[in-house]
């Protein structure tokens, strides 16, 4: 800031001298930009009341208004302008006013739209036009340059750092990651004097406009020493922009496609400059796409969409880091046999475990609670599917309707096969005895006071076998059935139970008749005294009898039960 403007601002607000010179006190900015602004005074037709330094500055400014952005010596006539005011009021700086400025704005906007629609990936974008929007009006995305310029033309009193559009790519991080010899420039102050969190308007225009845009203002070849000192950082940035054109184009297109591809899942709303940059990058894209760009453009073709882990790049994020996040996906969980056994055991207890049960299972099985929950959801769906399929394909002749025929413990021993396989649920001797008694029951006269079975051909429910009092209470058990239970009680082998079940009816009647005179007390004593070895011997004898008689499935007692 030159001394004459500091004196001019401090004459009205004397307390501004106590402020830090590097932070550009808000009082000085208010007096320079707000009250003594040549723009506002010329807009009001009060140019005759300008002080001498500002009036002397107005004529060179009018002379330089129409000059292009990349002219060789844009600031030769107004070397007294400090760099901050030069950014604001110089050519391409975003504060050109009236007359030629408005015409240049319309022409440049039309040129920007045409070039954006027709240019190739390396097409030259037009110089950014001056703002034609009213103060505070947001750009509508007609072009990246117009968007950034209009954002820079916010109202004097309401211009804040938070209103400036975010830069679409973090320049220093992306250059550093791409291996470019990048020396970060000193943090430039923005219009309000804050440390350079948001770059000045020329840099915003250069970044948003893409690599094909013209060099930013101040990149001229002026030979004056003071001009080179004032614009040294801007020239460095322009040279880097030309050298790293390919990297910046690739990163801009990556970020633009990420913003356009996933607008719904993006938590950060794209600002005007970023949206315009995205539109320009996609519109100017021509020819073949590299494999990396095709992967970015159609990520679902390569990896499938995963709603949990899809990541949207925000406007200020680093594009390479976001690309790595987008490539991650959750693979299918592979369960070990032990984990599956434990999960199945828990599923047998309850189909809907609570959160504590799920967490306990997860800790015990070294899984996450979410994986356990998803497993139970899938298992319930599979169970419902099997249940529905079993109910639809159930033949009418089976004793148990629907899925009960597949899940009931006694179902393998009630079908037509002569020697059914071992069923793990048949580990209770009482259940085996009840099955044998039910198999022998139709061939014997029912004992007095006992419940009668349904007629032949009617399906037998679970309560018929296990819930009827005839199999539970000793008072309803005749001596013949007591003897049968005494021989069946200690059985643990399914083959023995199957052999007794498939035994022909005369053999069962003979076995029952041999103990017909025994009372229930004697039956209980025999049940306690009998040994497993004797029962195994009897089972072998029964198997031998079955082999000798050559029993066919049609004459088995399983058919008689039905």
Curated annotation (Swiss-Prot):
InterPro entries: HD, Homeobox_CS, Homeodomain-like_sf, OAR_dom, Paired_Homeobox_TFs
Record keywords: Developmental protein, Differentiation, Disease variant, DNA-binding, Epilepsy, Homeobox, Intellectual disability, Lissencephaly, Neurogenesis, Nucleus, Transcription, Transcription regulation
Outcome after substituting residue 358 to S: Abolishes sequence-specific DNA-binding; reduces transcriptional repression of LMO1 and SHOX2. Abolishes transcriptional activation of KDM5C
Keyword Cytoplasm: no
GO function terms (MF aspect): chromatin binding; DNA-binding transcription activator activity, RNA polymerase II-specific; DNA-binding transcription factor activity, RNA polymerase II-specific; DNA-binding transcription repressor activity, RNA polymerase II-specific; RNA polymerase II cis-regulatory region sequence-specific DNA binding; RNA polymerase II transcription regulatory region sequence-specific DNA binding; sequence-specific double-stranded DNA binding
Subcellular localization, as worded in the UniProt entry: Nucleus
Annotated effect of mutating residue 370 to V: Found in a patient with a neurodevelopmental disorder; uncertain significance
Acidic residues: bias regions: 223-253
Record feature DNA-binding region, as residue ranges: 328-387
Composition-biased stretches (Polar residues): 160-172
Region annotation Disordered: where it falls in the sequence: 1-21, 50-81, 118-255
Role this protein plays: Transcription factor. Binds to specific sequence motif 5'-TAATTA-3' in regulatory elements of target genes, such as histone demethylase KDM5C. Positively modulates transcription of KDM5C. Activates expression of KDM5C synergistically with histone lysine demethylase PHF8 and perhaps in competition with transcription regulator ZNF711; synergy may be related to enrichment of histone H3K4me3 in regulatory elements. Required for normal brain development. Plays a role in neuronal proliferation, interneuronal migration and differentiation in the embryonic forebrain.
Protein family according to the UniProt entry: Belongs to the paired homeobox family. Bicoid subfamily.
UniProt protein name: Homeobox protein ARX
Protein's organism: Homo sapiens (Human)
Gene (name only): ARX
């Amino acid at each position: 800031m030159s001394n004459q403007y500091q004196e001019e601002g401090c004459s009205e607000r004397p307390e501004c001298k106590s402020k830090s010179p590097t932070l550009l006190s808000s009082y000085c900015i208010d007096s320079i930009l707000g009250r003594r602004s040549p723009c506002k005074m010329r807009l009001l037709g009060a140019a005759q009341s300008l002080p001498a330094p500002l009036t002397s500055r107005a004529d060179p400014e009018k002379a330089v208004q129409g000059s292009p952005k990349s002219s060789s010596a844009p600031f030769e006539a107004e070397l007294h302008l400090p760099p901050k005011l030069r950014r604001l009021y110089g050519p391409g700086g975003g504060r050109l006013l009236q007359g030629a400025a408005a015409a240049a704005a319309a022409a440049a906007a039309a040129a920007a739209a045409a070039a954006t629609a027709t240019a190739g990936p390396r097409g030259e974008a037009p110089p950014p036009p001056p703002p034609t929007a009213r103060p505070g009006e947001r750009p509508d995305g007609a072009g990246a340059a117009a968007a950034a310029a209009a954002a820079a033309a916010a109202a004097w009193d309401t211009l804040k750092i938070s209103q400036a559009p975010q830069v679409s790519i973090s320049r220093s991080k992306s250059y550093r990651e791409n291996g470019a010899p990048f020396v970060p420039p000193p943090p430039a102050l923005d219009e309000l004097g804050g440390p350079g969190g948001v770059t000045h308007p020329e840099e915003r225009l250069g970044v948003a406009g893409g690599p094909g845009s013209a060099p930013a203002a101040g990149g001229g070849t002026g030979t004056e020493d003071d001009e080179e000192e004032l614009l040294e950082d801007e020239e460095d940035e322009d040279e880097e922009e030309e050298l790293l054109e390919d990297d910046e184009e690739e990163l801009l297109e990556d970020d633009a496609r990420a913003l356009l591809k996933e607008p719904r899942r993006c938590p950060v709303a794209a600002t005007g400059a970023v949206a315009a940059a995205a539109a320009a990058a996609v519109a100017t894209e021509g020819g073949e796409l590299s494999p990396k760009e095709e992967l970015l453009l159609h990520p679902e073709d390569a990896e499938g969409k995963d709603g949990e882990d899809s990541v949207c790049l925000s406007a200020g994020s680093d594009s390479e880091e976001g690309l790595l996040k987008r490539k991650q996906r959750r693979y299918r969980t592979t369960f070990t046999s032990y984990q599956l056994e434990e999960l199945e055991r828990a599923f047998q207890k309850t189909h809907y475990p609570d959160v504590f049960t799920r967490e306990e299972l997860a800790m015990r099985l070294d899984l996450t609670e979410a994986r356990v929950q998803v497993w139970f959801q899938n298992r319930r769906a599979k169970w419902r599917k099997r249940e529905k399929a079993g109910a639809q394909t159930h033949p009418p002749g089976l004793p148990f309707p629907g899925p009960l025929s597949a899940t009931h413990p006694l179902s393998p021993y009630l079908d037509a096969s002569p020697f059914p396989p071992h069923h793990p649920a048949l580990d209770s001797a009482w259940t085996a005895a009840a099955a044998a008694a039910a198999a022998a029951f139709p061939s014997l006269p029912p004992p007095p006071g006992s419940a009668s079975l349904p007629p032949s051909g009617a399906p037998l429910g679970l309560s018929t076998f296990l819930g009827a009092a005839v199999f539970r209470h000793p008072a309803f058990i005749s001596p013949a059935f007591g003897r049968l239970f005494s021989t069946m009680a200690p059985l643990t082998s399914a083959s023995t139970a199957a052999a007794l079940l498939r035994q022909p009816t005369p053999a069962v009647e003979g076995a029952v008749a041999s103990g017909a005179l025994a009372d229930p007390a004697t039956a209980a004593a025999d049940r306690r005294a009998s040994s497993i070895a004797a029962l195994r011997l009897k089972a072998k004898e029964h198997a031998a009898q079955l082999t000798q008689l050559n029993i066919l499935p049609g004459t088995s007692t399983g058919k008689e039960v039905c």
